[in-house]
Amino acid sequence: MFHILSIVNIIWLLLALCFGAAFCLNKFSVKLPNRVEHVFQDFIRYGKTKENIKRASWQLVFDLSKRYFYHFYVVSVMWNGLLLLFSIRSVVMSEAFPDWIIDVLGSLTGRSRGAWNEIHLSTLLLQVLLWVHTLRRLLECLFVSVFSDGVINVVQYAFGLSYYIILGLTVLCTNDSLPQSESVSFFNQLTWYHVVGTLLFFWASFLQHQSLSLLAKMRTDSSGKVETLAHKMPCGGWFELVSCPHYLAELLIYAAMCVCCGCASLTWWMVVLYVLCNQALAAQLCHEYYRSKFKTYPHHRKAFIPFVL
C-alpha cells in the first residue's frame, strides 16, 4: 500500500488529474468568469492555439518564444545522459549510485538504499530509450521543425525544464517495482517484451519524425528554404486520420516503454496516464484551431486517436 502511495506515483497521478480536468473544463470554460477563463486558457494553450484568445496585457509579460522548446531537450540529454552513465557504471563496474541520487530516489519511493543495488535490464533499457528519444527531439527542434512566432508562458517553460529531470528520476524509481533477478545474469534477463517494446518504440518514433517533417515541409520549398511561417492545413501520412499524429506517437512511445518493463511498473503506468491526458488536451486544442481556421477541414478527422478521439 505504501508503495502505491509513494510520492513519485502521487506526483504523476496529480499531473494526470490536472490535465484530465483541464481537458474536461475546456469545453465549459465559457461559463467561467471572464478573468478566470482568460487565465485558464492562457495556461493550457501555447503556440498557434493562443492566437485567438483574449489575454490581458499583464499576461503578455510572461510570454516566451516557442522556439525555446529545444531547451527542454538540452536539459534532458544532459541530465538523463548523466543518470544513464551512473547506471552503466553500476552494471559494468558494480559501482554504487551517488548518495544524493539514492537519497532522492528513496524519498520518492519510500524504499531503502538496497532497492538500487541491482539495476534491472528493463530499467537500463528505459533509460537508453528515453535518452535516444530526447536526443532525436533535440535534433528535430534544431534542424527539422520550422517554428512560427508562437509563444509559451513562463510557467509552461519552467514545467518543461523540470519535466525531464523528474522523468529521468522516475525511470530509476521503476527499478524497485520490477522483479529482482540476482540469480540471473544481467543480459540473460532479456525477454520477449524487451524486443516488442523496443520495436514499438522505434516505429512510434518514426511516426513522430515523419509527422513533424510533414509539418515542416508545409513551410519550406523543395530546397528546404523557409517560405512562410503561416499555419496551413496539414495533410498526408497519419494526418489523414488525426489532426495531431505526433501527439499520438508521443503516447505510443511512452506505451512502448511500458511494454519494455513488462507492463509491471505501476509508476510507469502513472506516467503513461499523464501523457495520455496531456497530449489529449494539446491535440484537442489544435484540432479546434484547425477546424475553426479551415472551412474545408475533413469532418472525419479526429484530434488524437483514430476513429475515437
Swiss-Prot record:
PROSITE patterns: S5A_REDUCTASE
Membrane topology recorded in Swiss-Prot or TrEMBL: Multi-pass membrane protein
GO biological process: dolichol biosynthetic process; dolichol metabolic process; dolichol-linked oligosaccharide biosynthetic process; polyprenol catabolic process
The enzyme's E.C. designation: 1.3.1.94, 1.3.1.22
Annotated PANTHER family: DFG10 PROTEIN (PTHR14624), POLYPRENOL REDUCTASE (PTHR14624:SF0)
Protein name listed in UniProt: Polyprenal reductase
Residue numbers on the Cytoplasmic membrane side: 1-3, 89-114, 172-185, 277-309
Family: Belongs to the steroid 5-alpha reductase family. Polyprenal reductase subfamily.
Gene: srd5a3
Ranges that cross the membrane: 4-24, 68-88, 115-135, 151-171, 186-206, 256-276
InterPro entries: 3-oxo-5_a-steroid_4-DH_C, Dfg10/SRD5A3
Function noted in UniProt: Plays a key role in early steps of protein N-linked glycosylation by being involved in the conversion of polyprenol into dolichol. Acts as a polyprenal reductase that mediates the reduction of polyprenal into dolichal in a NADP-dependent mechanism. Dolichols are required for the synthesis of dolichol-linked monosaccharides and the oligosaccharide precursor used for N-glycosylation. Also able to convert testosterone (T) into 5-alpha-dihydrotestosterone (DHT).
Main location: endoplasmic reticulum
Lumenal side: 25-67, 136-150, 207-255
Signal peptide annotation: none
